[in-house]
């Protein structure tokens, strides 16, 4: 049977192949996030195109692997999950170096770094000169930065760490082989802010003993983002590196502005941010950005070994799927949702006799007092919220107890300060939160709180007395089905 595929169809086939190749080659030449997002079919085509460049996937030759690592994968499912990109990125000792037998994987790594830089430029950090995507969590990425600076500062023993009650950033210092000099925040009305004077005094006293100052831009309220502009000026004046822990700070326009201003007025050596918290990809990667290419190159050279390409792959696919046209939408939506969340939480707090902490520079996290719940019952309330499917919210109870992390003792760990308080509830509006989630959050919070307070009142009555606790009777509370 003769084929009916004629000259016209053949021309069309060649045109399709040519347009596909043109699209892929254009992407590689420009190395920028495309204007419009790609379809899933095109993303599959892109991955196949990349993997065809690795020697173990070549179709024009039969490779004979004679080394200890040849991209061999035993399980077909695992191979498909990795889209045949099995070599990883970098070479032993440098994440930026090209792997000759893994050209496609190396191209993927290059695109992820260039896309990351482009993304930061779109967000407002236009003076960033270089970026690297690493298959490490935020804490390990901070540790990698500090490790890379060891030779530059051979007398260094310490890192100034502005207290943020989140374990991984503190552990990153000790993992890199240094000790933390802990600076407690100071109180500015409701907010906990940077003690700039103490940092300046320590920098003046310690000098060459300091590896760097680590600041934090994203945190749970009432902790405020650090004053990185003032710290960068101190670091520049005394020639001390400045490491910024910007875990999920890319979601905040104010944080972006502060990072850019800190670079302009002082010194910022590296800025580390989480991929999953900012770009909605699976956990496992971080983005290290620098305002000098040499800063990022030295960090890349400190990585001991070859690295997984999975975080780079996920980030590239996400940016290609969005395109520039849709890239900023989640960030703009987060800003709107945060303002809406703050209004709702303020209204709820007023209804139940509580108040929301005023931390104007924190554009992601909120804190509400829990004065109507006895301190001994506050963590139970947090458990009730979790059992109702409210994840991520946390209750912080004031405590005199000490918590030891890496040999450092903290009073009232979780509160970012040793100061005592009446307990509070933290909730956050992170990127990707939808309107229906916010509405459901407050529906569940409202009903859970009302039932919890009524139950406490019943317990008081059974004990033969009343604590005088206010039982909210607002119409919006579901008073049925205790």
Swiss-Prot record:
It is found in: Cytoplasm. Residues 1-36 are annotated as: Tetramerization. Its cofactor is pyridoxal 5'-phosphate. Substrate binds at residues 91-92, 99, 306. It holds the Pfam family SepSecS. Keywords: Cytoplasm, Protein biosynthesis, Pyridoxal phosphate, RNA-binding, Selenium, Transferase, tRNA-binding. Pathway: Aminoacyl-tRNA biosynthesis; selenocysteinyl-tRNA(Sec) biosynthesis; selenocysteinyl-tRNA(Sec) from L-seryl-tRNA(Sec) (archaeal/eukaryal route): step 2/2. It comes from the Eukaryota. Belongs to the SepSecS family. NCBIfam families: selenium_SpcS (TIGR03531). This is O-phosphoseryl-tRNA(Sec) selenium transferase.
